[in-house]
Design a protein with these regions (language model features):
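Metabolite-binding pocket within alpha/beta catalytic cores that recognizes anionic/polar moieties
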Residues: 1-114
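Active-site rim beta-loop-alpha module in soluble metabolic enzymes
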Residues: 95-167
Length: 167
């Protein structure tokens, strides 16, 4: 849905759950603005899109009880999505990745987590003062990746406890 809010043109788009769906939306919105579909080439002038994801999340740390509004300063991805794109190490916060893996004693069988920073100017524009700012985690699934166990055992049953203690 596209309309105006306080004189600014905005589009609201549902992406579904997960990084894989967001990957589709981001790439296709970028293509609509920056690719000439007749010639199948990039347009000479690029349009930068400002995207804000609004959604739900669970909370593992005590300062984020249920119902708390959270604004991500950084996001750690367990899904591996960014690893499929070039320049990964230029985009990611490698120091936070390394420290996270060290503190939680990361199990390399799970994959390689990545950490990206939010745009601080955008964060300051949209995040209210009563929002908790911090690191959020994006998982590639709902059950095992988020520490939920039904019948299939978890590779690291203590991962959520270790994440809770991450500083």
């Amino acid at each position: 849905i596209t309309g105006t809010y306080k004189g600014k043109r905005i589009t609201v788009q549902s992406t579904g759950i997960g990084c894989d769906n967001i990957d589709i939306v981001v790439n296709e919105l970028d293509a609509l603005k920056n690719i000439d579909f007749k010639t199948r080439t990039e347009k000479p002038e690029h349009t930068t899109l400002t995207l804000v994801r609004i959604g739900t999340c669970g909370g593992l740390q005590l300062n984020c009880p249920a119902g708390t509004f959270v604004a991500s300063q950084k996001s750690i991805g367990f899904d591996g999505l960014i690893n499929f794109y070039a320049r990964r190490n230029e985009i990611c916060d490698l120091d936070t990745e390394k420290e996270f893996k060290r503190q939680v004693k990361w199990n390399d069988q799970i994959g390689n987590p990545y950490c990206v920073d939010n745009n601080p100017e955008l964060l300051d524009r949209i995040a209210a003062d009563d929002m908790v700012r911090g690191i959020t985690i994006a998982c590639g699934g709902f059950y095992g990746p988020q520490g939920r166990e039904l019948r299939a055992p978890l590779a690291d049953p203590e991962l959520n406890t270790k994440i809770e203690a991450f500083e």
